[in-house]
Structure formats: C-alpha cells, structure tokens
C-alpha cells in the first residue's frame, strides 16, 4: 500500500485553487474555505474526507470484480488519466465522449467487434492481397475507431462506476451514467454542481498537478482493492485445494 495522501500533498499540488468568485456555483459553498484575490479556495480537509469516501466505495465495487470507466477528455487530464487507467487495466475514454457510449452500449459493442475483426483481418494474408486504396481505407477506418473506442476495447459489459475529471465538460457521460444508475465519482471544481454526482471530490480540475495527484490517489485505492481481490481468490483456491486433498486422503484410507 502506497503512502496515504495528506493535506500538504494536496496543498503543494495546488488542489485548493478554485475559479474566480464570479464563476462559482453556490452549491459548492460547503466545500469552499475562503475567498482570496477574487478566487475561491477549496477546503482541503473536505477534499481529504471526500477522497476517502470515494475510495472506500470504489474499493467495494472493484473487489466484486467489476470495472471502473475513467473519463477525462480535457487536454491537461488526458495523459495522466490514460496512463493510470492502462496501469490498472481499467477502461477509459480520453479522446472524446461518444454519445450513447453507455446508454447505447449494445451498438458500441458492435463497433468494438468490428474493430476487432479489422485487426484480425489486417494480420491475415488476405489483407496484403487488397489493392493500396482498399488497404488505406480499411486502415483509416480502424484508426478512427481505435481513437475513440480503443480505451474500452476490452469492456464486455457496462462499467460498475465512472470516474470523471471536470463535471461540466463531461456532462453527457454523467447524464448517461445517471440514467442507468451507474455511480459517478468526480473531481468537482468551484464552478460546478457537486449534486449531479454521487461522490464529488472538491478540487482544482484545471491544473495538471492537481488532476495527477487525485487521479493517482483514486488509482492507488483501486490497485489496493485489486490486490485484496487477488488475495481473497488465492486464499479461496488454497482452501479448496486443501479440502480436496483431505477428501482424497480420506477416500484412500477407507
């Protein structure tokens, strides 16, 4: 288990810097510490509490074997969110949100199967027999699908939760999740409505350092849950093997 995130870590990463006071959403009032130089400052003690609550809930989801979809299409979040999702072998959408990715998942699955078929076809000898134009068309189509859907290529069923950076930018993804009853975990800045998500984490959603530290904190929680799940499965397998051996030994004695 990695070092637990502390108040100073959040402070050093600028997690407390909100938006200009004139851009605030009054529903964020419970999470705001003060106003300074026309900017709202977020109460980092509240951020820590919310982060703990989010990780505890995510832990339960991940230990059940379900997936968490990472969603972050804003430029400064794409790299770190993609890297963390890949590290955890979790699905992600960081290029753009394809409308219906959740609410029309059956159609999305068809596109994923098409992408998989194209990949197999391009490795086949038959691909080289196509003329140059046909190969180019096929390659471009696959590339286009991969750009949008590559991050969810291994998603065989709807995710059990989504983790979002910037609720204003990802409002379509959040609306789709809410419609399907999928819990939403999100970094929420002072210009946003925290009530539209299930687990808001009040924080600066614009600065790279802030996005990084919180995404990695969420990622660490998920990693811990995955390790616990593996341990539980290994223990169950060991117990099963022991019971089987006992039964076998008993049968031999008889």
UniProtKB/Swiss-Prot annotation:
UniProt cross-references to PROSITE patterns, sorted A to Z: RIBOSOMAL_S2_2
Residue spans of biased composition, Basic and acidic residues class: 226-254
GO molecular function ontology, one term from the record: structural constituent of ribosome
Keywords of this entry: Ribonucleoprotein, Ribosomal protein
CDD domains: RPS2
Origin: domain of life: Bacteria
Biological process terms in GO annotation: translation
Gene3D superfamilies according to UniProt: Glucose-6-phosphate isomerase like protein, domain 1, Helix hairpin bin
Keyword Ribonucleoprotein attached: yes
Gene Ontology annotations for the cellular component aspect, listed alphabetically: cytosolic small ribosomal subunit
Family matches, as InterPro entries: Ribosomal_uS2, Ribosomal_uS2_bac/mit/plastid, Ribosomal_uS2_CS, Ribosomal_uS2_flav_dom_sf
Flavoprotein recorded as keyword: no
Region (Disordered): 225-254
One Pfam family linked to the record: Ribosomal_S2
Similarity comment: family membership: Belongs to the universal ribosomal protein uS2 family.
Protein name: Small ribosomal subunit protein uS2
Organism, scientific name: Cytophaga hutchinsonii (strain ATCC 33406 / DSM 1761 / CIP 103989 / NBRC 15051 / NCIMB 9469 / D465)
């Amino acid at each position: 288990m990695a070092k637990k995130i502390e108040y100073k870590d959040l402070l050093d990463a600028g997690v407390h810097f909100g938006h200009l006071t004139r851009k605030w959403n009054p529903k964020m009032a419970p999470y705001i510490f003060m106003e300074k130089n026309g900017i709202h400052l977020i109460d980092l003690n509240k951020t820590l509490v919310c982060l703990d609550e989010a990780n505890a809930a995510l832990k339960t989801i991940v230990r059940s074997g379900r997936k968490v979809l990472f969603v972050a299409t804003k430029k400064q979040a794409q790299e770190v969110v993609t890297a963390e999702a890949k590290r955890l072998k979790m699905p992600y959408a960081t290029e753009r949100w394809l409308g219906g990715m959740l609410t029309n998942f059956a159609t999305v699955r068809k596109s994923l199967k098409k992408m998989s078929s194209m990949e197999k076809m391009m490795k086949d000898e038959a691909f080289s027999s196509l003329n140059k134009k046909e190969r180019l068309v096929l390659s471009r189509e696959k590339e286009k699908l991969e750009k949008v859907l590559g991050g969810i290529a291994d998603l065989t069923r709807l995710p059990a939760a989504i983790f979002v950076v910037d609720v204003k930018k990802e409002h379509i993804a959040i609306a789709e999740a809410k419609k399907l009853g999928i819990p939403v975990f999100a970094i929420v800045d002072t210009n946003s409505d925290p009530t539209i998500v299930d687990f808001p984490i009040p924080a600066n959603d614009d600065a790279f350092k802030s996005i990084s530290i919180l995404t990695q904190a969420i990622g660490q929680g998920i990693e811990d849950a995955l390790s616990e799940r593996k341990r539980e499965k290994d223990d169950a397998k060991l117990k099963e093997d022991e019971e089987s051996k006992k039964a076998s030994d008993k049968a031999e004695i008889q």
